[in-house]
Amino acid sequence: PGETPPQAFRTPVHCAEMSDDGLVYDCDRPSNRISIFQRDGTFVSEHIIAPATLSQGSTWDLDFSPDEAQTWMYLADGQNMKVYVIRRETMEVVYSFGDGGRQPGLFFAVHSIAVDSDGNIYTTETYEGKRIQKFTFMGMAEVSGNTGAPWPADRRRGGD
């Protein structure tokens, strides 16, 4: 942490996803870095996520929101046990959800992430997590920071 990221990937790339506008996003997990390239391999930019993360890094897998502009990127971070919601145009982390644990909405090494056409988010966990979770899209709202576990549902609605 705190050092200039290497010019090359530290290990084999852990994820590579193409957005609808033809940009390729990759996860350089141990460098806590998402690199963006054109289809022809031309470098566009790189972005460090959770720079103080040690060990296995913060960038495990990513996917995009289903809207036409793919406004949002969802990033699985197995080391810090959360999902980041990132504004794709600026690569700003808007908020995150999750924490370490085995209850619904918590993660034990969230490893993979996918978003369906309705905006529902699916995550898988590795090591001893060994499960899939579905986070149902319920609309847009202003949030920031780490919202913690999106569970139980009755807490979100004020207990009704």
Short names for language-model regions:
Residues 1-160:
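Eukaryotic scaffold repeat domains enriched in small/polar residues
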